[in-house]
Amino acid sequence: MKKALLLLFVMLCFALQGKCINIGKQSLSADNKRWDVWQTLALKGQLYGKRCYQIRYVRDNNDVFRRGYILFLDGKTSFASLKLPLTDDECKNFSVDSLMQTKRGFMLLVTWGGGKYLYTLKYIVCYRQASFFLDSIITQLYEPEKGRKKTTYKRMKRPLKMKGMIALPELLD
């Protein structure tokens, strides 16, 4: 039995090729424990050429409130970040539900609200000219008491370039 477990462990080590898997608490690098990574989306393919982008949903361990951010990375270099609202303090029941790759970039899906109104927002981010741009926002408002659902499509007149620090609450308007 012990030999079988040892063999399984050795095979697993070779399969991982020395890469360590941490579930729950990952950091951007071994010496940087500031970020608690909750989700990572690797963007690869013909659209991006030889570049390897990562979109990461992280929490700041140095912040008392553990504020969330969406980090845009080109390799190991961060070139933009979305500052997310604090749950229940700045935005009731705010949560990042998913990051999904699309044909032209990626989509960030967030929900917030509770009681009378529940919101689902889809931020559509497109990649063109070697940059990411916020292209459109799809908002769904659901009123549980009335059983109504309203969907709003907002295409940006001038797409917002993902560069530097951007606060998400500004995008909710």
Cite the ranges covered by each PLM segment:
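Sec-dependent N-terminal signal peptides
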Residues: 4-14
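Acidic/hydrophobic-patterned starts of short beta strands in beta-sheet-rich repeat architectures
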Residues: 46-58, 101-112
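Structured domain cores in non-transmembrane regions
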Residues: 77-102, 109-113
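Acidic, small-residue rich beta-repeat scaffolds with periodic aromatic anchors
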Residues: 20, 24, 28, 102-173
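Beta-propeller blade termini
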Residues: 25-47, 91-104
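Beta-propeller blade repeat segments, especially FG-GAP/WD-type strand-to-loop junctions
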Residues: 65-82, 124-128
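Short, surface-exposed coil-to-beta transition loops
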Residues: 65-67, 94, 117-122
